[in-house]
From Swiss-Prot:
<dbReference type="GO" id="GO:0021587">
    <property type="term" value="P:cerebellum morphogenesis"/>
</dbReference>
<dbReference type="GO" id="GO:0000981">
    <property type="term" value="F:DNA-binding transcription factor activity, RNA polymerase II-specific"/>
</dbReference>
<dbReference type="GO" id="GO:0000977">
    <property type="term" value="F:RNA polymerase II transcription regulatory region sequence-specific DNA binding"/>
</dbReference>
<feature type="domain" description="LIM zinc-binding 1">
    <location>
        <begin position="56"/>
        <end position="106"/>
    </location>
</feature>
<dbReference type="InterPro" id="IPR017970">
    <property type="entry name" value="Homeobox_CS"/>
</dbReference>
<dbReference type="InterPro" id="IPR001356">
    <property type="entry name" value="HD"/>
</dbReference>
<comment type="function">
    <text>Transcription factor involved in the regulation of podocyte-expressed genes. Essential for the specification of dorsal limb fate at both the zeugopodal and autopodal levels.</text>
</comment>
<dbReference type="GO" id="GO:0001764">
    <property type="term" value="P:neuron migration"/>
</dbReference>
<dbReference type="GO" id="GO:0030901">
    <property type="term" value="P:midbrain development"/>
</dbReference>
<dbReference type="GO" id="GO:0002930">
    <property type="term" value="P:trabecular meshwork development"/>
</dbReference>
<dbReference type="Pfam" id="PF00412">
    <property type="entry name" value="LIM"/>
</dbReference>
<dbReference type="InterPro" id="IPR001781">
    <property type="entry name" value="Znf_LIM"/>
</dbReference>
<dbReference type="GO" id="GO:0007613">
    <property type="term" value="P:memory"/>
</dbReference>
<dbReference type="GO" id="GO:0046872">
    <property type="term" value="F:metal ion binding"/>
</dbReference>
<dbReference type="GO" id="GO:0007626">
    <property type="term" value="P:locomotory behavior"/>
</dbReference>
<keyword id="KW-0238">DNA-binding</keyword>
<dbReference type="GO" id="GO:0042048">
    <property type="term" value="P:olfactory behavior"/>
</dbReference>
């Protein structure tokens, strides 16, 4: 927190000795150019005995006139010594800045210091108040909240280019620290107002626990309800700049009929609201990303667990395919022949009806190794068929 010092002259802010910035030159001397009297000799005509001629600072040409102008230890032609802005001849005094000369009126118009409060020019003869790099009129050096003029010895704070006295700064600090982020906006929309209404049966409980140790007798802050037109004007100005200067706030206050303090608090709350929305959006994005990442990790783990368990192979029923016999292609019954009626006491089927016949159904399924032995034991089935036929007709 700074302490205001006494008023000082503007010339102390910009000393004359700084040649690189600007300085006022009070004395413009006119000197007579020294010429050698009498008839000119041959050496003078040839230039061997001529003194070194003065060079004009403006046009950089030698000065051959009888009179020349001396400014800041430099020589000028009389016609070259003029204002760089209005081209008027300079006779008594001038201002020097960036190797150029200016008259008093043009210099004050172009390079005069401006008040940081009203943005108007400050005359060189006025007393000013300084705060860091800012310069103020005596009347403009006041608090932006209570508009009390700050004098020598008063404590103040320069915040965002605005002056605040000690009392208002502490009030604003307490106000910003006491307001929660959810209630930072003094002007709520209709849907937000509906969400802020407490439920029945919770009113007394919220009153008792809402202050968190603060004085319950502390009066509530006045609440300003903005109209649609005022809100539109504020939002349009906020889109241009979220931190308007004092002049813009005063213009908005005059247009909307509100005080400058209300305008300032609205912009502060709006900035806090935008920060809160941006923070909430960022949290939602992070939550969605974490959920998506968790689902991907869970699915990958499930796939890994399923891949670790190999599926059980279905029990393969060992079905023994019956080998195709050599007579499969030449079926004796495919030409419509009816099988002969065999007598029951035929010696050929005696072994089949005996005890050594098939004992179970499983004996019907023969492996490939059993087929050869069966053929060797029984013989060629076609030969057996012919023998059966011949024996039938013989009987």
């Amino acid at each position: 927190m700074d302490i205001a010092t006494g008023p000082e002259s503007l010339e102390r802010c910009f000393p004359r000795g700084q040649t690189d910035c600007a300085k006022m030159l009070d004395g413009i001397k006119m000197e007579e150019h020294a010429l050698r009297p009498g008839p000119a000799t041959l050496g003078v005509l040839l230039g061997s005995d001529c003194p070194h001629p003065a060079v004009c600072e403006g046009c950089q040409r030698p000065i051959s006139d009888r009179f020349l102008m001396r400014v800041n230890e430099s020589s000028w032609h009389e016609e070259c010594l003029q204002c760089a802005a209005c081209q008027q001849a300079l006779t008594t005094s001038c201002y020097f800045r960036d190797r150029k000369l200016y008259c008093k009126q043009d210099y004050q118009q172009l390079f005069a210091a401006k008040c940081s409060g009203c943005m108007e020019k400050i005359a060189p003869t006025e007393f000013v108040m300084r705060a860091l790099e800012c310069v103020y009129h005596l009347g403009c050096f006041c608090c932006c909240v209570c508009e009390r003029q700050l004098r020598k010895g008063d404590e103040f704070v320069l915040k965002e280019g605005q002056l605040l006295c000690k009392g208002d700064y502490e009030k604003e600090k307490d106000l910003l620290s006491s307001v929660s982020p959810d209630e930072s906006d003094s002007v709520k929309s209709e849907d937000e107002d509906g969400d802020m209404k407490p439920a029945k049966g919770q009113g007394s409980q919220s009153k008792g626990s809402g202050d968190d140790g603060k004085d319950p007798r502390r009066p509530k802050r006045p609440r300003t309800i903005l109209t649609t037109q005022q809100r539109r004007a504020f939002k349009a100005s906020f889109e241009v700049s979220s931190k308007p200067c004092r002049k813009v706030r005063e213009t908005l206050a005059a247009e909307t009929g509100l005080s400058v303090r209300v305008v300032q608090v609205w912009f502060q709350n709006q900035r806090a609201k935008m920060k809160k929305l941006a923070r909430r959006h960022q949290q939602q994005q992070e939550q969605q990303n974490s959920q998506r990442l968790g689902q991907e990790v869970l699915s990958s783990r499930m796939e890994g667990m399923m891949a670790s368990y190999t599926p059980l192979a279905p029990p393969q029923q060992q079905i023994v395919a019956m080998e195709q016999s050599p007579y499969g292609s030449s079926d004796p019954f495919q030409q419509g022949l009816t099988p002969p009626q065999m007598p029951g006491n035929d010696s050929i089927f005696h072994d089949i009806d005996s005890d050594t016949s098939l004992t179970s159904l499983s004996d019907c399924f023969l492996g490939s190794s059993d087929v050869g032995s069966l053929q060797a034991r029984v013989g060629n089935p076609i030969d057996r068929l012919y023998s059966m036929q011949s024996s039938y007709f013989a009987s």
